[in-house]
């Protein structure tokens, strides 16, 4: 004679154990999320990338020209042209930021001030970068306003001063400390 108590225990265990095992399946990592894809392959350093809002271009800093310059890389599908050097000055350029419409790049250059000034390079026009700020002091990390009429940046008037965040209107050059 089979005792119902023992049978019922095994029956419950037979149902519960597979259910627990089902919820204990190890998660598989998604290769798209965990495997970065190398998109530059220079013998020197490539860093500080900024990607356009439409994802078609990237501007980055590289020392492959002998000093730190800005370079443009096309990110579209298929075979792309070689990366294009954007700045050609012997001073270091860095901290690029592509405008929301993808037509201009704000960046910091040490060409007129060893502490850094902000310049804008029009990607659609001939000619070199135009200075936005060329004053004594340190200006860094430019960021475009959404409407592209102003830049926000950090500045320090002297090596002992505390950094502050400022805004500069591109038309007229009015600076406002925030």
Please identify what each model-predicted range represents:
Residues 2-4, 25-178:
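Sequence signature of WD/YWTD-type beta-propeller architectures
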């Amino acid at each position: 004679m089979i005792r119902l108590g023992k049978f019922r225990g095994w029956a419950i265990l037979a149902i519960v154990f597979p259910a627990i095992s089902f919820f204990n399946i190890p998660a598989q990592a998604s290769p798209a999320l965990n495997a970065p894809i190398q998109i530059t392959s220079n013998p020197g350093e490539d860093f500080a990338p900024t990607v356009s809002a439409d994802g078609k271009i990237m501007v980055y800093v590289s020392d492959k020209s002998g000093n730190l310059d800005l370079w443009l890389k096309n990110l579209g599908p298929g075979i792309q042209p070689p990366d294009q050097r954007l700045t050609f000055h012997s001073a270091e350029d860095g901290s690029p930021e592509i405008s929301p419409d993808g037509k201009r790049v704000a960046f910091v250059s040490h060409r007129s001030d060893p502490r850094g000034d902000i310049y804008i390079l029009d990607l659609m026009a001939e000619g070199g970068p135009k200075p936005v700020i060329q004053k004594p002091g340190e200006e860094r990390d430019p960021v475009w306003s959404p409407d592209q009429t102003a830049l926000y940046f950090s500045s320090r008037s002297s090596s002992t001063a505390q950094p502050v965040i400022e805004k500069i209107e591109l038309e007229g050059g009015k600076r406002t400390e925030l």
